[in-house]
Every structure is written in structure tokens, then in C-alpha cells.
């Protein structure tokens, strides 16, 4: 069996995405359990601060219901397919809308001959092929619209986007 082909099959991606959207609230305890969490209020400023510039984090205690979630896939092609399917299904069912962001490394996550993965490269996007870069640009535009930010896949703005996503988790 060709596992990669099976994992990227459109029907499988549709079913997995539907399951996640249908069961997300239950699996992440939305509306079920609450806890107090210190929410970072100035995410964009903290994410954009350079190494020399120190920004004080502004946190506010807030009652939160449920948990955030990370959905990891095998590679860039899978990320593109799932992202598109999530967008399609959420457009059809707005009541199941989630806030989704995409982060991927562009070292292709391929194993070296010794079985050790290379370090993730979050410094620049120059190694991306045109299609992957265009996809990432579109996903970052969606993110900017969702959170009223102004990131891109260029240089420092990409590093700041990466930090912003991490801080919001």
C-alpha cells in the first residue's frame, strides 16, 4: 500500500476534517470545563520585538473554556490540502468555524541518513518552492485578517508571524 497516497487521499482528508470540526468542542472541553489563564494581551508587540528590544508582556487573568489544539501533518503538501479542506468545510458550516493558522518548516522535514531530523528553519522562506510560498502567503493573509495583524513570509515579518502564532497558543 502506498501510505502517502492513502494519507493524502481527498476522501480521507474530507472525513478527518469533518470529524475534527464535528468533535472539536467535545475533544477540547469547550463549554465543559473552565479554568483561569493569564492571557497575553499585547501578542503582536511581543512577537515583533527584536532581541535587543524588551517589551513588557501585558497579561490579564481570564476565565477560559477548553483548550487550544495543534494538528500536525506529514509535510507541506498535507498542510495545503488540510488547510483548503478546513476552509471549504467551515465556509459551508459557519457555526463550526475555528481559528486556523499554518506553520511549516522549509527544510522539508526529511530524515537524514543517520535518522536525525535537521533543525527547523524559521529564519527565511527563500528555500520554498513558488507554490508553497504562495500558499504560505495566502495563509498568512488569512491570519492577518483574523487577528488584525500585518505579517508576511518575508524576513523578520515571517519570524514575527511564527512567534505570534506560538504566543497565541
For the regions a language model picked out, list residue spans one by one.
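Conserved C-terminal RecA-like helicase domain
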Residues: 4-169
Amino acid at each position: 500500500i502506498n501510505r502517502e497516497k492513502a494519507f493524502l487521499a481527498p476522501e480521507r482528508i474530507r472525513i478527518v476534517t469533518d470529524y475534527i470540526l464535528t468533535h472539536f468542542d467535545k475533544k477540547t472541553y469547550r463549554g465543559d470545563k473552565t479554568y483561569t489563564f493569564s492571557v497575553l494581551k499585547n501578542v503582536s508587540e511581543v512577537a515583533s520585538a527584536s532581541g535587543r528590544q524588551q517589551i513588557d508582556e501585558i497579561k490579564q487573568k481570564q476565565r477560559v473554556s477548553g483548550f487550544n489544539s495543534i494538528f500536525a501533518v506529514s509535510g507541506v503538501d498535507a498542510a495545503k490540502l488540510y488547510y483548503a479542506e478546513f476552509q471549504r468545510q467551515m465556509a459551508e458550516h459557519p457555526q463550526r468555524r475555528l481559528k486556523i493558522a499554518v506553520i511549516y518548516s522549509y527544510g522539508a522535514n526529511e530524515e537524514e541518513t543517520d535518522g536525525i531530523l535537521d533543525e527547523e528553519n524559521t529564519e527565511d522562506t527563500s528555500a520554498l518552492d513558488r507554490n508553497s510560498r504562495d500558499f504560505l502567503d495566502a495563509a498568512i493573509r488569512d491570519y492577518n485578517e483574523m487577528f488584525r495583524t500585518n505579517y508576511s513570509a518575508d524576513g523578520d515579518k515571517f519570524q514575527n508571524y511564527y512567534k505570534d502564532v506560538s504566543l497565541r497558543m
